[in-house]
Amino acid sequence: MNTEIHYRKASENDIDFLLDLRTKTMNEHYTNSSLPTDRASTLQRVLYQFEKANIILFNNEPVGLLKIDRSKDPIEVLQLQIDPGQQGKGLGKTILQSILEEASSAGKKVSLSVLKSNKAQHLYSSLGFKAVGEDEHSYFMSFSDR
């Protein structure tokens, strides 16, 4: 797939975009998991480790969020959200494959968590992520080519 995916560091100017994105991509899953969907809870999730937030640009338009911590092993994908209007185009898969290649080159694993009600877990499994734990609401997944 020939995609023009770029990233830029998220800033305070992106908060409204990120609130809207999070509402569109996650509220259904939070509701299904009996987790709060009010604005304050959503803002708290947007601001969580905000210094690691990157706006995903597709053809120079903001289409999502990648929050990632590359500082340790495993590399942790904290949040990956693609606007529903851009889903199904392979963007998430392309982004994750790039992260997996980066991790492989660095000799690191990759971890993430996914709500049990979120169908994205099928994408993660198809890329080789394995569930290594769970809690009431989420699966904790890991990828390693070692």
Predicted regions and their residues:
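Short glycine/proline-centered loop/turn elements that form peptide/ligand docking sites
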Residues: 92, 96, 117-120, 137-143
